[in-house]
C-alpha cells in the first residue's frame, strides 16, 4: 500500500507546477514559450541540411540548377539564423530559469515559515513531528529548484524527441517502436531507485537530525565554552562520524544495486537503438531513400538518442523530486489541534470580572501522565497573583494554557465568563504579555528585540524606551556604541554579547512594551543579582498598574509582593491566600518559605560575623 501511495505522490507533478506558477507566473510563461521555440530549432536545422544535401546530389527537383550558389547561400543563412535564434533563446531561458529559481525557493520557504508560525505547540511534543519538520526544511529550498531545472530540461528534450520521432516515422514506425520499447526497462529501474532513495531518507531522518545536532554542538558558539572546558569535542565528533558512516553504508548499498541495473538496461537499449540505425543504413544501401533523407534520418536518430537518455533521466528525477517534495506537502497539511472558532467573539477590553480557571485538567499530547488536576483559580483586573510550587508541579504548563498554546482536557479558562476558545487566538494573545523561563535571544538590534513584543509600533515610539526603563536595561543600552540600534550578538559586525541577566531584562522589556491586560512572568528575575531584583520589583507595581499579573517564582522575596498566592503541588492546587495567611496555615508554602529563609539566615549570620550587611536582608523588610 505504501509503495502505491509513493508512486501516486511521485506522479503528482501538478502540485509542483502549481507552486511554480504561483511563485513566478510571468517567468514560467516565458520559459514555456522559449522551450517550444528551442525544441523546434534542431528539427528545422535538420530539414535544411537535408535540402542542402539533396541539392548537392541533384535529387531536389524544387531547386533550379541555374541558381545553385544563391540557393545554397539562402539555406546556409537560414541555418545560421536558426543557430543565432537558438543562442538567444538559450540565454533568455537561462535568465528566466534563474529568476524562477529564486522566486520559487523564496515562495517555498515562505510556505514553511507561515505553517511553522501557526503550528500548534503540541506538534513539537512528538519526535516524529520533528522528523516531518526536518524533511520539510531540508527539501523546501532545493527540491523546487531541481523541479524547475528538471522540468526545463525534460520539456526541451521531450519536445525535441517528439520531433525526432516524427521524422523517423516518415522512414518506418518500427524504428520508433524498437527504440521506445528498449527504453522502458531503463525508466522502470530509475523509478525503483528513486523510491528506494526516498524510503531510505524517511527511515534515516531521525539519524540525520541527530548528526546535525552533534555537528551544531561542536561548531556553534552556544556550547563552545563547555566543549572546551570539558574537552568532549572529539567524543561528539566521533558520534557524528558513526552516524554518517551508518547512513552512507545504507546509501552505498542502494546505489550499488541501482547502478548495476543501470548498466544492464542501458546496454540493452543501446543494442536496440543501433539495430534500428542499421535498418536505416540498409535502406540507404538498397537506395530506398535518398542521400539527403539518409542524412536527415541519421541526424534525427542522433537527436533522438541524445534526447532520449536525458528524457528518461528527467522523468525519473521529476518522479524522485515529487516524492521528496511530498514530505513538504505532508508538513503543510498537518491539522491544527488548537483551532480558531468559526464565529469568534471580541476579547473584552477592559476586563471586568477578570480571568478564571474552572476545574481544569491537562496532560501533554502523546503522554498518559496528568500534569494538572481540577485547577480552580481567579485573577482579577489589576491584581498581582503569584504561583508557587516545587519543580514539576505544573506552574509553567498553566501559563501555556492561559496563552492557549494548548487546550485543557477538561474544564475551561474564561475571561469575563467567556471561554478562551471563543476568541480568535491572535486577539487573545494580543492581550497577554509573557516572559518564559527559556526566553528568546534574538540576534537583532536591542530596539528590534523590544519591538518584537509589539511589531506594529514605530521604531521611535517612546514606549520602547519606557519598557526598557521598567525592565532595568535602559542605562546599559544607551552606553552601547550604537545605543538601541546595536545588534545583540557578536556573530554580526559591531554587535555586543549580553549576559544572561541582561538578556532576561531585554525579554522583560519585550513583554512590557505590549499594551496587554495580563502579564505572565515565569521566573522573571532568575538571572538577576540581588540588587537588580530589588530595583526591578520597586518599579513593577507602577508598571503593572491597571493590569493583571501572574508571577511564577521560587524566590519568596518576589512572591510576598503578590496580592494573592496559589500553591501547586504535583499538579493539584492545594493552598491559596496572601503571604501571612499561608504562613499561618503552616502547610507546603510555609515549609518552602522556611527552607529558603533558613538559607538566608545562615548567609546573613555568616556575613554579619564579618561586619558586612547582607543584600538578601533587603527583601525581608
Predicted stretch roles:
Residues 348-621:
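ABC-type nucleotide-binding domain
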Residues 28-92, 165-197, 271-278, 282-298:
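Transmembrane helix-loop-helix hairpins at lipid-water interfaces of multipass membrane proteins
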Residues 232, 276, 297-333:
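Cytosolic ends of transmembrane helices, especially the final helix of ABC transmembrane type-1 domains
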Residues 1-42, 61-75, 93-97, 114, ...:
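Membrane-integrated ABC transporters
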Residues 1-14, 101-145, 207-250, 322-335, ...:
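Extended non-transmembrane interhelical loops and adjacent amphipathic helices
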Residues 10, 46-53, 109-113, 126, ...:
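Alpha-helical transmembrane segments of polytopic integral membrane proteins
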Residues 52-55, 91-99, 103, 107, ...:
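Membrane-spanning helices that line or support transport/gating and their immediate boundary helices
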Amino acid at each position: 500500500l505504501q509503495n502505491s501511495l509513493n508512486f501516486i505522490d511521485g506522479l503528482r507533478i501538478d502540485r509542483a507546477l502549481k507552486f511554480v506558477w504561483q511563485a513566478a507566473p510571468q517567468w514560467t510563461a516565458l520559459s514555456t514559450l522559449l522551450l517550444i521555440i528551442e525544441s523546434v530549432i534542431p528539427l528545422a536545422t535538420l530539414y535544411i541540411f537535408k535540402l542542402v544535401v539533396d541539392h548537392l546530389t541533384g535529387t531536389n527537383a524544387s531547386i533550379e540548377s541555374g541558381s545553385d550558389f544563391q540557393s545554397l547561400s539562402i539555406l546556409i543563412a537560414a541555418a545560421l539564423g536558426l543557430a543565432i535564434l537558438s543562442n538567444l533563446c538559450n540565454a533568455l531561458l537561462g535568465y528566466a530559469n534563474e529568476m524562477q529559481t529564486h522566486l520559487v525557493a523564496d515562495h517555498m520557504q515562505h510556505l514553511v515559515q507561515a505553517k511553522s508560525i501557526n503550528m500548534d505547540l503540541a506538534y513539537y511534543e512528538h519526535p516524529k513531528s520533528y522528523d516531518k519538520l526536518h524533511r520539510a526544511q531540508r527539501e523546501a529550498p532545493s527540491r523546487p529548484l531541481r523541479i524547475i531545472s528538471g522540468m526545463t530540461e525534460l520539456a526541451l528534450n521531450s519536445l525535441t524527441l517528439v520531433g525526432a520521432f516524427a521524422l523517423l516515422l516518415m522512414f518506418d514506425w518500427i524504428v520508433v517502436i524498437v527504440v521506445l520499447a528498449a527504453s522502458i526497462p531503463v525508466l522502470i529501474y530509475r523509478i525503483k531507485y528513486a523510491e528506494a532513495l526516498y524510503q531510505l531518507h524517511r527511515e534515516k531522518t531521525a539519524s540525520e537530525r541527530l548528526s546535525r545536532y552533534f555537528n551544531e554542538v561542536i561548531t556553534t558558539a552556544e556550547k563552545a565554552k563547555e566543549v572546551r572546558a570539558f574537552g568532549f569535542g572529539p567524543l561528539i565528533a566521533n558520534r557524528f562520524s558513526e552516524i554518517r558512516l551508518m547512513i552512507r553504508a545504507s546509501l552505498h548499498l542502494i546505489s550499488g544495486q541501482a547502478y548495476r541495473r543501470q548498466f544492464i538496461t542501458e546496454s540493452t537499449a543501446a543494442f536496440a537503438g543501433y539495430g534500428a540505425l542499421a535498418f536505416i543504413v540498409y535502406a540507404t544501401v538498397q537506395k530506398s531513400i535518398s542521400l539527403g533523407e539518409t542524412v536527415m534520418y541519421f541526424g534525427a536518430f542522433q537527436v533522438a538518442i541524445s534526447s532520449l537518455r536525458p528524457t528518461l533521466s528527467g522523468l525519473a528525477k521529476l518522479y524522485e523530486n515529487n516524492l521528496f517534495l511530498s514530505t513538504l506537502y505532508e508538513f503543510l497539511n498537518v491539522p491544527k489541534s488548537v483551532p480558531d472558532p468559526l464565529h469568534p467573539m471580541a476579547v473584552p477590553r477592559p476586563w471586568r470580572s477578570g480571568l478564571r480557571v474552572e476545574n481544569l485538567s491537562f496532560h501533554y499530547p502523546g503522554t498518559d501522565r496528568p500534569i494538572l488536576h481540577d485547577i480552580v483559580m481567579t485573577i482579577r483586573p489589576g491584581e498581582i497573583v503569584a504561583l508557587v510550587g516545587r519543580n514539576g508541579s505544573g506552574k509553567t504548563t498553566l501559563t501555556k494554557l492561559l496563552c492557549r498554546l494548548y487546550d485543557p482536557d477538561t474544564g475551561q479558562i474564561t475571561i469575563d465568563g467567556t471561554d478562551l476558545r471563543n476568541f480568535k487566538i491572535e486577539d487573545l494573545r494580543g492581550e497577554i504579555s509573557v516572559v518564559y523561563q527559556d526566553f528568546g535571544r534574538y540576534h537583532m538590534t536591542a530596539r528590534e528585540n523590544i519591538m518584537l513584543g509589539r511589531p506594529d509600533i514605530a521604531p521611535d515610539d517612546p514606549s520602547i524606551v519606557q519598557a526598557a526603563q521598567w525592565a532595568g536595561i535602559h542605562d546599559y543600552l544607551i552606553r552601547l556604541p550604537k545605543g538601541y540600534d546595536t545588534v545583540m550578538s557578536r556573530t554580526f559586525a559591531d554587535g555586543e554579547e549580553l549576559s544572561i541577566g541582561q538578556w532576561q531584562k531585554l525579554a522583560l522589556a519585550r513583554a512590557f512594551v505590549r499594551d496587554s491586560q495580563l502579564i505572565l512572568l515565569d521566573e522573571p528575575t532568575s538571572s538577576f543579582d540581588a540588587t537588580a531584583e530589588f530595583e526591578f520589583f520597586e518599579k513593577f507595581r507602577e508598571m503593572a498598574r491597571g493590569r493583571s499579573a501572574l508571577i511564577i517564582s521560587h524566590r519568596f522575596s518576589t512572591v510576598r509582593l503578590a496580592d494573592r498566592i496559589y500553591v501547586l503541588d504535583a499538579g493539584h492546587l492545594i493552598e491559596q491566600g496572601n503571604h501571612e495567611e499561608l504562613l499561618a496555615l503552616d502547610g507546603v508554602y510555609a515549609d518552602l518559605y522556611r527552607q529558603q529563609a533558613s538559607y538566608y539566615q545562615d548567609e546573613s549570620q555568616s556575613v554579619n560575623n564579618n561586619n558586612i550587611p547582607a543584600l538578601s536582608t533587603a527583601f525581608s523588610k
